Structures are given as structure tokens and as C-alpha cells.
């Protein structure tokens, strides 16, 4: 198993050890396969997802049977929901003991199958290379996704003759299918005829590696671009035709008469393709590698099925119109995005509370990171309202440098797993995590993982002493102050970091953040900066989500 993974280009596996996978972990020693062990199987699989989001490569995690498998399911579910290429390997009770009350005996495949893109079970040591190769292939074929492979103890502990770790027929290069010429022609014609066209690039653009092609087409056709989810940075925010993120640039979408949607489903993240984000009289062009992802909540007027990079390359070649002179439309989009940013800034600047405004903390952090590292730093965001503020202020100049929890699933606790994976993928480069205190608590023990593996992640915790989203909803639904199970008072996350061998800082005034950040960077170890934020602050994004009832 270890040799097959290495032969197919896998360099790093995230895990938590257990008896059902010990031979695999032992074999990794001689195969130059880096093993990063976490403190919870959920963190291991989420870290594999973070590796994929940071690098564009397939992430791999290995967990033991039974409870280990169950703990890891959150990572499989999150990656499956977000179409992230991931392989979850799991141990399994030996086949001759299944159904007899053996240790950790669970029908794991039956549980994983409805979640995963592909789920398989291997009980023959001689077939391990083929199963592993196929798992890696399935994760990247067509629309990327999470796959599950279990190998039972009979196979893992058994003896097998030397095996070909690259079986016949593997590796198989992922399909780079272009769209039908007629569909591409129709899309280009609609965009040429439009007065106010817009490109919205979703996660599929990242997995396709289509940034160059999208940027070129945007300049050629003079169409503003918005990037969302994993596609943040695919077209840099500094690109001459970029409107930045969906938070601010998205305000231009209702004014567009034609929207080219690249690699994004019409889910809750984009208001299901409806109001207030999308209009009813717009021409919608949807490009996706998987036909089953097209339409759904919003029908597309023109559909192109194909890999986004070759589709956009063909769009560039098909574009024969003279430059349409859409600078005025670009200026209008920038004005709308700028007005949105100013609106968010006013919420911060008009704050009079004694504790720090969460938005002020992340705005200051984003400015400091940009000043000191430009676009080379990796930023991770986790939480509810903490995530909203991060989405409003974190810039993105390179793909895989802004990792967030922007799945429709809404998984919390991904922050530390994503951050340590990004740091493992980019040794020597800075990685920053901005997270709420509630979400940080779900994976806080991974500070120990980062310390143990010398991954100097810097986590900035917006500590408003509770589950801010939940408190807000409780206030709105049941009346002010009726908070049940939503307060987390008196926790010193900086001291937790110190107890785990890391560096800790506590920030009570905004001006203390910059020197605390400097000391954390200089410490050279995983650091936690506990920022005391105002529990009464609520972002407009959270208010809007609650009002629209997107859940």
C-alpha cells in the first residue's frame, strides 16, 4: 500500500494510528512517505482535504477500523460535499471475523458508500496495488470527489509476493475533455452580445487549473471576474478585470445581463441561483465537467460540459469580436464592490464597544499579512461570523492560498487541520489561521500536532466567549438573552497553546495585535493569539443568511 501510494506521487499521509493499519504505517518508513499523525481521525481526514485545497493534489488519510473510521467520516463528508479529491483509507476487521463480535467490526463500506464518490473493500493482499491505484484515479476522474477504500486485516497483515505497484492500466490521466464546439460557440456569441457580462469562477476552476485561461478570456472579451470558494486566487484580486470575492464583487451580479458560471453548483453559497444574488432575466451560461452538476436550482440557458481549462481556451480561440469597450461596466462593478467594502468598514469604524471588533481584528491582520508577505502567505478561515469577516477582508493573489469552510455543508473545526496541511505542503512559507473560539475548540488539540511536526502555524482566535452565530439566532428567535448551550466563557487559548508546547499571546486592544503577531512569527513554533472580541458584534452576512432562511 505504501509503495503504491508513493509510486503514484503521494508524498504525505495524515493519520491516527490503530492496530488495523500498523503494517502500513511501518512500511511507510522505507518508502519515503511522510506520515503526519493528528490527535483525532476527523482532523486527519480534514487535513488531507486541506492538503488537496492547498496543492491541487489528491489528499490521502489513513484511519483504523471502527471508531477510527467513524471519527474520520466528517472529513469524508466535507470533501464529498465540496467535490475535493481525497482518498480515505481505512483498516477493517479481518473477513473471517466479521459478524462475530470482533474488535471494531463495523460494516464500514455500507456507511461510507452513500457519502463517497466510490467505496470499495479489499481483502486480498495481491490486489492492494490495483485498489489503491483505482482509488487515486477515481478521486480525480470527471468531477473530483472523496473516495473510500478499506483493506481488511487479513490483507494488511498477510504475506504477498512482490507486487507491481503500478498495475496495468494505471496511472490514468484525468480527462481534459473540451466542450462541444456548438455549445462553446453559443456561449461566446451570448457573451459577445451582452452589455454587462460577468464571470463567476467556482471551485471547479481551481481543480481544472484554469486561471490562465480565465484571465486571458476576461481580458480578451473585457468581462469582469468574481472568484469564489476554492477558486479564490485562480484569477488574482489584482487582475485588471477582477472584482475580487463574492462578498464584495457579488454585488455586481444582479446588474449583469449575462453570467458565465464556471465550476459552481447553484447551492446555498450562491443563493441557489436566485434573488437577491441573481436576477430572473439574465442569460445564464454554466460550464462544468459533470453534467449532473448543471442546473438544479437554477436552469442554465446555455450549458457547456467539459473541463474548464480547455473550454476557456477554446472560448479564447472562438472569440473574434472587436474589443467591446466594457470599461464603464468594469468601473460600475468596482464601484459596487467598493461600496460593499465601505459598508463593512463602517460597521467596524462605528463600533463603540470595549472589546475588540472581530472585523477590526481580521482587517488589521489582513493588512499586516499583505504588507509583510504580499500574496505568498496562506490564510485559513474557520467559524461562523469569524469566517464572514475573513471572507470580507482576506485578499487572494494565488490559487490554494485562501482555505475556508465555504461549503454548503457548513463544517466547523477545519481550521487547524487545513492550516497544518498547508504548512506541511509549504515549509518555510507563512500560514495564518483566523478562527472563532467555538470552531477552534473543535480541533484545538491539533496545536500539539503542529508543534510535534514543526509546523509553525499561527492561529488568531476571535474569542467572543461563545458560539456567536447560535447566540444571534437565539436572540432573534426566542428573545434577547435566552442563550442555551451557546456560551464559552473564560477560556485562555493562549495558555492552551503554551501547555501544548507552542507560543501563546493574549490581545485585549487592537494595537497589541501587530506586536503579538511579530512575536509569534519570531517564536518559530505553532502559536495561538487569543484576541478578546466583542460578543455583541454580528456581521451583515450573518444577518442576511438568517433573514433569507438559507438553511
Give residue spans per PLM region.
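Active-site diphosphate/adenylate-binding microenvironment
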Residues: 1-2, 6-8, 16-29, 335-417, ...
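N-terminal alpha/beta PP-like core and its mobile active-site loop of ThDP/TPP-dependent enzymes
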Residues: 1-328, 343, 368, 456-459, ...
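Short acidic loop-to-helix transition motifs that present clustered carboxylates
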Residues: 20, 41-46, 69, 386-388, ...
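Phosphate/pyrophosphate-binding active-site segments
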Residues: 126, 150-151, 163, 281, ...
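Basic phosphate/pyrophosphate-binding loop/patch that engages nucleotide-derived ligands
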Residues: 141, 373-374, 451-456
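Thiamine diphosphate
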Residues: 89, 97-104, 253-256, 295-297, ...
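Conserved short loop/turn motifs at secondary-structure junctions
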Residues: 202-207, 350-353, 436-438
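Generic recognition of flexible, low-complexity loop/linker segments
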Residues: 136, 185-188, 213-214, 248-249, ...
Amino acid at each position: 500500500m505504501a509503495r503504491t501510494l508513493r509510486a503514484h506521487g503521494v508524498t504525505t499521509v495524515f493519520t491516527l494510528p490503530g492496530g488495523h493499519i500498523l503494517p502500513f504505517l511501518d512500511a511507510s518508513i522505507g518508502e519515503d512517505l511522510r506520515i503526519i499523525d493528528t490527535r483525532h481521525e476527523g482532523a486527519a481526514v480534514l487535513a488531507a482535504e486541506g492538503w488537496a485545497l492547498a496543492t491541487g493534489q489528491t489528499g490521502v488519510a489513513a484511519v483504523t477500523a471502527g471508531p477510527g473510521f467513524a471519527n474520520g467520516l466528517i472529513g469524508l463528508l466535507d470533501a464529498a460535499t465540496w467535490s475535493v479529491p481525497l482518498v480515505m483509507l481505512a483498516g477493517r476487521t479481518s473477513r473471517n471475523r466479521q459478524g462475530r463480535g470482533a474488535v471494531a467490526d463495523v460494516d464500514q463500506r455500507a456507511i461510507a458508500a452513500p457519502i463517497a464518490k466510490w467505496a470499495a473493500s479489499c481483502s486480498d493482499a495481491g490486489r492492494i496495488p490495483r485498489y489503491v491505484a483505482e482509488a487515486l484515479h477515481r478521486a480525480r476522474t470527471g468531477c473530483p470527489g472523496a473516495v473510500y477504500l478499506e483493506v481488511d486485516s487479513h490483507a494488511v497483515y498477510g504475506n504477498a509476493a512482490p507486487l507491481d505497484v503500478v498495475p496495468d492500466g494505471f496511472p490514468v490521466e484525468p480527462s481534459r475533455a473540451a466542450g462541444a464546439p456548438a455549445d462553446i460557440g453559443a456561449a461566446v456569441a451570448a457573451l459577445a452580445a451582452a452589455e454587462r457580462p460577468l464571470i463567476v469562477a467556482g471551485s471547479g476552476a481551481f481543480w481544472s487549473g484554469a486561471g490562465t485561461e480565465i484571465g486571458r478570456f476576461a481580458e480578451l472579451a473585457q468581462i469582469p471576474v468574481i472568484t469564489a470558494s476554492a477558486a479564490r486566487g485562480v484569477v488574482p484580486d489584482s487582475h485588471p478585470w477582477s472584482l475580487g470575492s463574492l462578498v464584495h464583487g457579488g454585488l455586481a451580479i444582479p446588474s449583469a445581463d449575462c453570467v458565465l458560471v464556471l465550476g459552481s453548483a447553484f447551492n446555498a453559497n450562491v443563493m441557489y441561483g436566485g434573488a437577491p444574488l441573481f436576477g430572473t432575466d439574465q442569460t445564464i451560461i454554466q460550464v462544468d465537467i459533470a453534467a449532473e452538476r448543471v442546473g438544479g436550482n437554477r436552469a442554465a440557458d446555455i450549458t457547456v460540459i467539459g473541463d474548464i481549462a480547455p473550454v476557456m481556451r477554446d472560448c479564447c480561440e472562438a472569440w473574434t469580436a472587436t474589443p467591446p469597450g466594457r470599461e464603464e461596466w468594469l468601473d460600475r462593478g468596482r464601484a459596487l464592490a467598493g461600496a460593499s467594502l465601505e459598508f463593512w468598514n463602517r460597521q467596524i469604524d462605528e463600533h463603540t464597544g470595549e472589546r475588540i471588533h472581530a472585523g477590526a481584528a481580521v482587517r488589521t491582520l489582513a493588512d499586516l499579512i499583505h504588507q509583510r508577505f504580499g500574496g505568498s502567505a496562506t490564510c485559513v478561515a474557520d467559524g461562523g461570523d469569524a469566517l464572514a469577516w475573513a471572507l470580507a477582508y482576506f485578499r487572494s493573489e494565488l490559487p490554494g492560498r485562501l482555505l475556508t469552510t465555504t461549503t454548503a455543508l457548513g463544517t466547523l473545526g477545519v481550521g487547524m487541520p487545513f492550516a497544518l496541511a498547508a504548512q506541511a505542503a509549504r515549509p518555510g512559507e507563512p500560514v495564518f489561521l483566523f478562527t472563532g473560539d467555538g470552531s477552534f475548540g473543535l480541533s484545538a488539540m491539533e496545536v500539539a500536532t503542529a508543534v510535534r511536526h514543526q509546523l509553525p502555524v499561527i492561529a488568531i482566535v476571535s474569542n467572543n466567549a461563545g458560539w456567536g452565530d447560535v447566540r444571534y439566532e437565539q436572540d432573534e428567535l426566542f428573545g434577547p438573552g435566552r442563550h442555551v448551550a451557546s456560551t464559552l466563557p473564560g477560556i485562555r487559548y493562549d495558555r492552551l497553546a503554551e501547555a501544548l508546547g507552542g507560543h501563546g499571546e493574549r490581545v485585549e486592544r487592537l494595537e497589541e495585535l501587530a506586536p503579538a503577531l511579530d512575536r509569534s512569527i519570531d517564536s518559530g513554533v505553532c502559536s495561538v493569539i487569543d484576541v478578546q472580541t466583542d460578543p455583541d458584534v454580528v456581521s451583515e452576512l450573518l444577518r442576511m443568511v438568517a433573514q433569507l432562511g438559507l438553511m
